[in-house]
UniProtKB/Swiss-Prot annotation:
It is a single-pass membrane protein. InterPro entries: GDU (IPR040359). Residues 1-24, 120-148 are annotated as: Disordered. Its main location: membrane. A motif (VIMAG) lies at residues 99-103. This is Protein GLUTAMINE DUMPER 3. It comes from Arabidopsis thaliana. The gene is GDU3.
Length: 148
């Protein structure tokens, strides 16, 4: 190295009274360990959440309890299990719909759907049925299968 001179770092500058560090350099002064540490923490949290979801799914399906062959919902397509003769069939209840009417004091109503057959000649009879009814009646022609 011709022409260049090497000056070693000075321990103490007399005018400033500051010392130039000769101590060990810490890797925590860089943002890289924090970046990878945060990334590892997030991936660990995601893995933990997926583990919780998998365990709760297995518990609800009866896999961990050994009830996979004793469940009530048997696969009848396989053919090895006969349908249960003593099973109680559910009672068919009428369907109810929640209709929200905007602008009223109490805007919530329960309605029973009804199919109304409409003819084009009988317009007066249609208005009489709708006035005294609390039921929701579809007005479109597609809902009852007729075309005009």
């Amino acid at each position: 190295m011709e022409g260049r001179q090497y000056y070693p770092p000075r321990e103490n500058v007399e005018g400033n009274r500051t010392t130039m560090g000769g101590g060990p350099h810490s890797p925590w002064h860089s943002p890289v360990p924090y970046l990878f540490g945060g990334l590892a923490a997030m991936l660990g949290l995601i893995a933990f959440a997926l583990l919780i979801l998998a365990c709760s799914y297995w518990r609800l399906s009866g896999y961990l309890d050994g009830e996979e062959n004793q469940s009530r919902e048997r696969d009848l397509e396989v053919g090895d299990v006969k349908p249960d003769k003593t099973a109680v069939k559910p009672v068919a209840l009428p369907e109810k719909f929640l209709v929200i009417m905007a602008g009223n004091v109490k805007p919530t109503y329960l309605a029973t759907p009804s199919v109304k057959t409409c003819t084009c000649d009988d317009d007066d009879d249609e208005d009489d049925d709708v006035e005294g009814s609390d039921q929701v009646v579809p007005r479109s022609s597609e809902s009852n299968g007729e075309t005009h």
